Amino acid sequence: MGIGCWRNPLLLLIALVLSAKLGHFQRWEGFQQKLMSKKNMNSTLNFFIQSYNNASNDTYLYRVQRLIRSQMQLTTGVEYIVTVKIGWTKCKRNDTSNSSCPLQSKKLRKSLICESLIYTMPWINYFQLWNNSCLEAEHVGRNLR
C-alpha cells in the first residue's frame, strides 16, 4: 500500500473518519476534573460513607463533612475519584437513626481526609468501592482540610 492507495477516495474517507473517531475518544482518556450532578454526588457520597462505616471498627459513626475534590472517568460505568473530609458523629455504631447525627464536640472531634475510587452505574443504582485511603486531617496539608 504505497502512495497510490490514497488515490482511492473511499480509502481516504475511511481513514479520515477513523482518525476523527479516534481523536474523539482520546479526549476522554484518564480522569477529568468535572462536577458531579447533585443527585450523583449525594448517592455516591452516601454509598461511600455507609461502606466506610461498615468497614470501620470505631465506636462512633462518621459522616461526610465536605467534598474537597471529585474527578470522573467514563468507562463501562462512571469511575469517581473523590476526596472528602469525614468526621466522627455523636452516634454510635448500633444507633438506628444515624442519618442526622451531629458531629462530636471539640473534646472528641476526629476528622479524616479520604481519597476513594468508586465505580458506579448510577442508572441502575450500582456502586462499588474499589480503593480507599484515609489519613487524620491534621496530618494532611492545609489545602485539603
UniProtKB/Swiss-Prot annotation:
Glycans are attached at residue 42. InterPro entries: CSTL1, Cystatin_dom, Cystatin_sf. GO terms for molecular function: cysteine-type endopeptidase inhibitor activity; cysteine-type peptidase activity. Keywords: Disulfide bond, Glycoprotein, Protease inhibitor, Secreted, Signal, Thiol protease inhibitor. Residues 37-115 form the Cystatin domain. Disulfide bonds join 91-101, 114-134. GO terms for biological process: signaling receptor ligand precursor processing. GO terms for cellular component: extracellular region. It is found in: Secreted. Residues 1-19 form the signal peptide. Its main location: secreted. Belongs to the cystatin family. PANTHER family: CYSTATIN-LIKE 1. This is Cystatin-like 1. It comes from Homo sapiens (Human). The lineage of its organism: Eukaryota, Metazoa, Chordata, Craniata, Vertebrata.
